[in-house]
Amino acid sequence: MSKVLVLKSSILGGYSQSALLVDYLIGKWEKQGATITVRDLAGKDVLPMVDGEIASGLRGGAELTARQQEMLDLSNALVEELKANDTIVITAPMYNFNIPTQLKNWIDFVARAGVTFTYTENGPKGLVEGKRAVLITTRGGAHKDGPTDHMVPFLKTFLGFIGITDVDVVYAEALNMGPEANQKGISEAKASIDKLAV
């Protein structure tokens, strides 16, 4: 049975287009027997903003403050959750040409040297291997494969850096360019989801 971690990151909650699409995916995959864990990074599961004290504490050490230890424990739990699942589904609405702050914050909590990646004499090596990722990205305009799409290249780079190179991307484009364009973008995204196996 496939285990799936879904990361929601829209600040619009249930009103967001990315939430609509990921709920569509969840409904299909649950019917196929997948066990799905949802983490709402912009809702009930919002993470603290990583600051200097937290970043220093995530490196570990013998003398951590109480807050640093709490944040290190949280990071360890997030990494364990990531590693425990077979597929990671990331919803990423485009905000000002990039990913939501809440999603970037999750990345900062799980991207840890010696834990999710390591440095070797041949360069960095990801330690979260044998996983698959699905990116569901929603945009008001049309950005796919263009110079204004900084999201998908960034997310693929991050995932590859920690060892996840099997990545599918679902695009929902031009959602704010009129009712017809919105309907077309959502329909095409759902068609892409229909082609994905658990």
Swiss-Prot record:
Superkingdom to which the source organism belongs: Bacteria
Co-factor remark: Binds 1 FMN per subunit.
Pfam families: Flavodoxin_2
Keyword Oxidoreductase: yes
Catalytic reactions of this protein: 2 a quinone + NADH + H(+) = 2 a 1,4-benzosemiquinone + NAD(+); N,N-dimethyl-1,4-phenylenediamine + anthranilate + 2 NAD(+) = 2-(4-dimethylaminophenyl)diazenylbenzoate + 2 NADH + 2 H(+)
Entry EC number(s): 1.6.5.-, 1.7.1.17
Keywords: Flavoprotein, FMN, NAD, Oxidoreductase
InterPro entries: Flavodoxin_fold, Flavoprotein-like_sf, FMN-dep_NADH:Q_OxRdtase_AzoR1, NADH:quinone_OxRdtase_FMN_depd
Disulfide bonds: none
Molecular function terms from GO: electron transfer activity; FMN binding; oxidoreductase activity, acting on NAD(P)H as acceptor; oxidoreductase activity, acting on NAD(P)H, quinone or similar compound as acceptor
Signal peptide stretch: none
Known function: Quinone reductase that provides resistance to thiol-specific stress caused by electrophilic quinones. Also exhibits azoreductase activity. Catalyzes the reductive cleavage of the azo bond in aromatic azo compounds to the corresponding amines.
Family: Belongs to the azoreductase type 1 family.
Protein's UniProt name: FMN-dependent NADH:quinone oxidoreductase
Species this protein is from: Shewanella oneidensis (strain ATCC 700550 / JCM 31522 / CIP 106686 / LMG 19005 / NCIMB 14063 / MR-1)
Gene: azoR
